[in-house]
Regions:
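N-terminal targeting or regulatory segments adjacent to alpha/beta-hydrolase or S9 domains
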Residues: 1-68, 76
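Proline/glycine-enriched tight loop/beta-turn segments at coil->beta junctions
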Residues: 79-82, 90-100, 110
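Cap/lid segment of the alpha/beta-hydrolase catalytic domain
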Residues: 96, 102-195, 205-206, 252-255
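Mobile cap/lid helix-loop segments that gate and shape the active-site cleft of serine hydrolases
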Residues: 176-187, 199-200, 237-278, 283, ...
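Alpha/beta-hydrolase fold nucleophile elbow
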Residues: 209-221
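Glycine-rich nucleophile elbow surrounding the catalytic serine of serine-hydrolase chemistry
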Residues: 219-231
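Short beta-strand/loop motif that positions the catalytic acidic residue
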Residues: 281, 288-290
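C-terminal catalytic histidine-bearing segment of alpha/beta-hydrolase fold enzymes
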Residues: 307, 313-346
Length: 346
């Protein structure tokens, strides 16, 4: 009998092994490649939801570890709101405007709360310590205004959490379920989340201590996904830090199935691989964090991704705008270059 395969997973991986994305950067003219590729990549995201008035409401102000914080509620869509945490540097003076960083969270129970420094329980402290996760809080202490919202399916916007608990997910990942819903409407989770992030950015730019001309974005893991898409979709972003979200879809996606509906769009891999997506941000400044001991995105293929991004930035005559923080930890924020990087470019 011929050698047969009954595993769909093996089928997809073998497809990936022989696949070359149609618009993978081949070393040609960068400007022509970017001009042709970026609109096609954006089209894979589908429709973006309509924008609505923000109707901001300040819920509470407090101070934590010297950092003044605010919790706001804003409307980010016709049928959906988001809670927003804003952190201000301890040395912020009246009338002063500061560079501002969008601090995007990744997967995890607590969403934006950990990134913005909520260490109010042993479980929350453990997550922050394990991932060096409170970069929104740390960057505020370093002199930047920072802010964050929850993405769909995580933190306060997860339907498994009170007070809006829904048990019908049956243990399935809400990221995948929301993606299925979104595609039925011709959208994607990325297009919806990006729109919600842009709404939050619109609001924060109205605050008197925010300089709207000096915006950056950073995020770990799934937050790295959203950092990348925010950077590509929102021209206001002057610099970006992608933390532990470098790899090849052939490996972390098709082989390891280490992705979800929050990270994908129909036909995206037909067009580009992850290093191509990162390279499309050129020539703007990009800092990439890679953990040597990362068991989520293996250092071997993470570095292969980074070397491809290096070639794209070189073709864009922007090698000096690409930086690497290679650090000896697990899946986490390196945090060794972030302050200087954003201090230089914002």
């Amino acid at each position: 009998m011929a050698n047969r395969n009954l595993s769909p997973h093996h089928m997809f991986w073998q497809m990936a092994l022989e696949h070359k994305p149609l618009h993978s950067f081949d070393g040609g003219d960068f400007a022509s490649w970017q001009k042709e590729t970026l609109p096609k990549v954006m089209a894979t995201l589908g429709d973006f939801p309509d924008r609505v008035p923000l109707n901001p409401e300040l819920m509470v102000e407090w101070e934590h570890d010297g950092v003044k914080k605010q919790r706001w509620m804003i409307d980010v869509g016709k049928f959906i709101s988001a809670s927003l945490i804003v952190s201000m540097p301890p040395d912020l003076k009246p009338g002063e405007k500061r560079p501002t960083i969008l601090a995007w969270h990744g997967h995890g129970q607590y969403g934006k709360d950990s990134v913005m420094g909520n260490d109010s329980s042993p479980e929350r402290r453990a997550e922050i310590d394990r991932l060096n996760y409170n970069y929104g809080h740390q960057m505020a202490k370093a002199g930047f205004v920072t802010f964050a919202i929850d993405w769909m399916g995580i933190g306060e916007r997860c339907d498994s959490h009170k007070p809006h608990f829904k048990g019908h997910a049956g243990g399935r990942d809400w990221c995948n379920l929301y993606y299925l819903h979104a595609t039925m409407f011709g959208m994607t989770s990325i297009s919806i989340n990006v729109t919600h992030g842009m709404a939050a950015t619109d609001f924060v730019c109205t605050l008197p201590f925010v300089d709207p001309d000096r915006l950056g974005v950073m995020g770990l893991s799934g937050g790295g996904t959203m950092t990348l898409w925010s950077a590509l979709c929102d021209e206001r972003m002057k610099a970006a830090e992608i933390i532990c979200y470098s790899d090849l879809w052939e490996v972390f996606g098709m082989r390891d199935t280490n992705y979800c509906g929050m990270q994908v769009a129909p036909g995206l891999y037909k067009l580009v691989d992850l290093p191509d997506l990162q390279g499309l941000f050129a020539p703007k400044p990009l800092l990439v964090d890679i953990g040597v001991y990362d068991t989520c995105f293996n250092v071997d293929t993470a570095m292969e991704c980074y070397r491809k991004v290096e070639k794209i930035y070189a073709a864009a005559d922007a090698s000096d705008k690409l930086e690497l923080d290679l650090f000896p930890r697990e899946h986490a924020w390196g945090g060794n270059k972030s302050r200087d990087f954003f201090g230089k470019y914002l």
